[in-house]
């Protein structure tokens, strides 16, 4: 289901880096039904599992994007976990460049990196999904009233969007995303970095139904606008039981490097705690 079709990407959600890489080995590469993946032809590794290196952090140069987690916009406990993650990365042999500065993070509002094209993409998607269905457009969804009240305004706002070819906002977004891509690439080149690091979220998870507490979602700040790959790995817990993540972002086609970094970090820190609601599976299942 499209949300931002020009930014959306399907990736594995898994218990461990090993599991995520096993899935990635299957889904990575060119898909004729997804034109965006055409650029990956000739760039896919024969196997990504070979980059699972327990010593993968050693020698990596990692830039810290503190603009995404200042004391003013980040939960104090998340800050502590991030500082510990940086200490762990240093202990594992990484060279930490702290901080690095990406001017466009300050000059481009986060919302101006996304074109609201949902209406056009969902109107294209639904008829192809089920040609005989009664609901074929966003307008049909709105008329049905079969949606959560919390998203009603957003649905009406998306329905009011002008055609993409006439949408001035989307034209500006296209320019902004190019600026952000070039800025991130330049910072990495200027500092000879292998990857950038920052907390995936600046605040702990919110309670279900809480739409007002700050959430501080950093995961879409750099990766979707640039198209560069990123991997999140657990970096501990806050409030005893709420997980927080470390996001590691690299250049285009740098998945092998990212896998080395996150696997080495995961194996050395072992932050994951299986939830009590999901007991271990018997061996081989």
Where are these regions (language model features)?
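Structural helix-boundary/capping segments
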Residues: 1-63, 71-72, 83-90, 225-285
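Short, surface-exposed loop/helix-turn segments at secondary-structure junctions
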Residues: 37-43, 167-171, 191, 203-221
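Short helix-loop capping/hinge segments that flank enzyme active sites or metal/cofactor-binding pockets
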Residues: 49-67, 116-185, 234-243
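General small-molecule cofactor/ligand-binding pocket signal
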Residues: 95-100, 231
